[in-house]
Regions:
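Conserved P-loop NTPase motor module
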Residues: 2-15, 20, 129-135, 376-488, ...
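N-terminal pre-Walker A segment at the start of P-loop NTPase domains
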Residues: 16-35
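Phosphate-binding P-loop
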Residues: 30-31, 36-44, 237-238, 277
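The conserved Walker
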Residues: 49, 53, 326
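Conserved lysine of the Walker
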Residues: 57
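Conserved ATP-driven motor cores of ASCE-family P-loop NTPases powering translocation/secretion/packaging/pilus
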Residues: 63-65, 88-109, 307-393
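P-loop NTPase motor domains
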Residues: 65-75, 82-307, 333, 376-378, ...
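Membrane-active amphipathic alpha-helices enriched in small hydrophobic residues
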Residues: 526-529
Length: 529
C-alpha cells in the first residue's frame, strides 16, 4: 500500500485507504485495546457530542466528519471558532501526533490530508453566500429573529397570508418592508378577511427590521436562495463534500444563528424525498453551540424542532447536536439522539452535579466503571461513548480515547482557503440577484395608481377649466346680450326721438303753412275789399 505523507484537497484519493472508515463502520477511538466503532447505517439515528469547553468536542466532530467523507457521505459543519476550516488542509506532523498514531495502531497507515471542502458564509467574507428568501423563512421563524410580540407576530402572519393570496414573492427585506407598508395603507380593506391590523404593530415590525439589516439580514435574505441539493455532493474520488459554514460572526447573533439552523433543517425535511433507512446517510449535520437552538424558544418551536428531528431521519439525514451539556437540549429532542459522545463535564454546584448525573443515566450501564464518576475524570480527547449497533440496540457505555484527525487542527492559511473556494464549483451563489418580487410589483402598482390619480386630477382640472370657461362664456354672452339690448333700447329711444322731432317739425311746417295760407287768404280778402 502506497502511503502519502501529505495530501492536499485535490489529491488522488486512491493513494491511501480510508483508515478510519472500514466495512461500513467509523473507527472513532479505542476503549482499552478494543476499537470503538459507529455503524454508518445508524448515523441517521442522530447523535449528541457534549462536553465542557476544551475537552475535545471539535476533534470528535472532525474525526466523524472525515470518516463520513471517506465513506462518500456529505457533511455540514458549523465553524464557530474558525478552527474547523482546517479540514480542507493536511494536518501537521509532530512527536505527539506520532505517539498517538502508534497508540491507535495506525503506524504506516495514517496520512495527513485535507478533505473536499466548500466554505459558506452568510456575511460573504469567508465563503460563498448563503441566502434564503423571506418567504422560505416563514413568519414563525422571522418573528423569533425579530423578537416580536404575540400581536406583532399575528400581523406578520397576515402579511405573509396577503403575499400568498396575491401571489407576491417575498425575496428580501425590501419586499417585506414594501408589503408591510402596503398592508398598513389598505388595512381597512383587509380587516374583515384577515383580522385587525394596527399601525402600531406594523411600525414595530418595521423598526425591528432595522437592526436585522445591520446584523446581516440584508445579505442573508435574497436570491439566489440556497439549494440544499448543492450540499449533497461528492468529489471526483467519491468522497463526501464537507460543507463548512463560517459562524464566527454569525454566532454573535444567537437568535439569527439558531433560526438559520432550524430553517435549514426544515428546508431539508421539506425538500428531500422519503427514503427510509439506508446503508449510509445522504447527509450528516453537526450543529455546534446547539443550546442556542433552544434558548428562549417558545414551546411550539421546541415541538417543531422535535418533530423535524424525529422525521428527518426518514429522509436519510443525520443530525448531531454539539453542546456543552446534555441539559442544554430538551428531553423530547434528547430522546431522538441515539448516538452519544460525552466528554468531560465540570461540576461544582448542585445543579451541575445533577446535570452530570442525568448525562450518566442516559447511557446503557457498563459494570466495569461508574459513568457518573468517569464523566468528571475524563481527560482531554477522552469521552464516554455509546452508539447503536447494527441491530439498532445501544451498546454499553465505553470509556474511549478519541482517534486523531488527519486534517489540520486550526485555521488554514488564507491562500489555502481561497483556493478551495475558487475550485468548488459554487460560484453561482457569489452574485446577488434582484428579481421581480413584491417590492417591484407594489412599486409598479403604486406608480400606476399615481399615474391614474394624476390623470384623474388632470381630467378634473380640465373639467374645472371647461366649466369656468363656459361660465365666463355665458357671463360674456349675458353681458353682450345686455349690451345689445341696451344699444337696441337706446336706438329705439333715439329713433322715437327722431320720429317725434320729425313729427313736430312736420306739424310745425304744417302749422306754418296753414298760418301762411290764412294770412294770404286774409290778405286776398282784404285786397278784394
Amino acid at each position: 500500500m502506497k502511503v502519502a505523507k501529505s495530501i492536499t484537497c485535490n489529491s488522488i484519493y486512491t493513494e491511501v485507504d480510508a483508515i478510519m472508515y472500514d466495512n461500513g463502520k467509523i473507527y472513532l477511538g479505542l476503549s482499552g485495546e478494543e476499537r470503538v466503532q459507529l455503524p454508518l447505517s445508524m448515523c441517521n439515528r442522530h447523535g449528541l457530542i457534549a462536553g465542557a469547553t476544551g475537552t475535545g468536542k471539535t476533534v470528535t466532530m472532525k474525526v466523524l466528519a472525515e470518516s463520513l467523507s471517506d465513506a462518500g457521505v456529505p457533511v455540514f459543519l458549523c465553524d464557530v471558532k474558525g478552527d474547523v476550516a482546517g479540514i480542507c488542509a493536511p494536518g501537521a506532523d509532530s512527536e505527539d501526533m506520532q505517539k498517538r498514531i502508534e497508540r491507535f495502531g495506525l503506524t504506516g497507515k495514517f496520512a495527513y490530508r485535507g478533505y473536499p471542502t466548500t466554505f459558506w458564509d452568510i456575511y460573504q467574507t469567508g465563503g460563498h453566500a448563503v441566502r434564503a428568501t423571506v418567504s422560505e423563512m416563514g413568519p414563525e421563524l422571522l418573528s423569533r429573529i425579530l423578537c416580536l410580540s404575540e400581536a406583532q407576530t399575528g400581523v406578520l402572519q397576515i402579511v405573509f397570508r396577503v403575499a400568498d393570496d396575491r401571489g407576491l414573492l417575498l425575496d428580501d427585506l425590501k419586499d417585506l418592508r414594501a408589503l408591510l407598508n402596503y398592508v398598513n395603507d389598505h388595512k381597512e380593506d383587509y380587516r374583515m378577511k384577515y383580522g385587525n391590523i394596527t399601525t402600531q404593530s406594523v411600525a414595530a415590525i418595521l423598526r425591528a427590521l432595522l437592526p436585522l439589516e445591520k446584523e446581516g439580514g440584508e445579505l442573508f435574505f435574497g436570491e439566489p436562495a440556497l439549494d440544499v441539493n448543492d450540499w449533497i455532493r461528492t468529489d471526483a474520488e467519491g468522497r463526501g463534500m464537507v460543507n463548512v459554514l463560517d459562524c464566527v460572526k454569525l454566532v454573535q447573533n444567537p437568535t439569527l444563528y439558531a433560526s438559520f439552523l432550524l430553517w435549514l433543517l426544515s428546508e431539508l425535511f421539506e425538500t428531500m424525498p422519503e427514503v427510509g433507512d439506508l446503508e449510509k446517510p445522504k447527509l450528516v449535520f453537526f450543529f455546534d453551540e446547539a443550546h442556542m437552538l433552544f434558548r428562549d424558544a417558545p414551546a411550539v418551536l421546541v415541538q417543531k424542532i422535535e418533530q423535524t428531528v424525529k422525521l428527518i431521519r426518514s429522509r436519510g439525514i443525520g443530525v448531531f447536536f454539539v453542546t456543552q451539556s446534555p441539559a442544554d437540549v430538551p428531553n423530547t429532542v434528547l430522546a431522538q439522539l441515539s448516538n452519544r459522545v460525552q466528554h468531560a463535564l465540570r461540576a461544582y454546584t448542585p445543579t451541575e452535579l445533577k446535570a452530570v448525573r442525568v448525562a450518566a443515566q442516559a447511557f446503557r450501564e457498563n459494570p466495569a466503571f461508574n459513568a457518573e464518576d468517569a464523566i468528571m475524570e475524563l481527560g482531554v480527547g477522552e469521552a464516554l461513548t455509546s452508539f447503536l449497533g447494527e441491530d439498532g440496540i445501544p451498546a454499553m457505555v465505553q470509556r474511549t480515547k478519541i482517534i486523531c484527525p488527519q486534517s489540520l487542527m486550526g485555521a488554514p492559511e488564507a491562500m489555502t482557503r481561497a483556493k478551495a473556494i475558487l475550485r468548488d464549483g459554487m460560484e453561482k451563489y457569489d452574485e446577488a440577484e434582484d428579481n421581480v418580487s413584491a417590492y417591484e410589483v407594489l412599486a409598479d402598482e403604486t406608480q400606476a395608481a399615481e399615474e391614474a390619480l394624476a390623470q384623474e386630477r388632470e381630467r378634473l382640472e380640465e373639467e374645472k377649466r371647461a366649466a369656468e370657461e363656459e361660465k365666463q362664456r355665458r357671463k360674456q354672452a349675458e353681458a353682450d346680450e345686455k349690451r345689445a339690448q341696451k344699444l337696441e333700447d337706446e336706438a329705439r329711444r333715439r329713433a322715437q326721438k327722431l320720429e317725434d322731432e320729425e313729427r313736430r317739425r312736420a306739424q310745425k311746417l304744417e302749422d306754418e303753412a296753414r298760418r301762411k295760407a290764412e294770412r294770404e287768404k286774409e290778405k286776398k280778402e282784404a285786397e278784394e275789399k
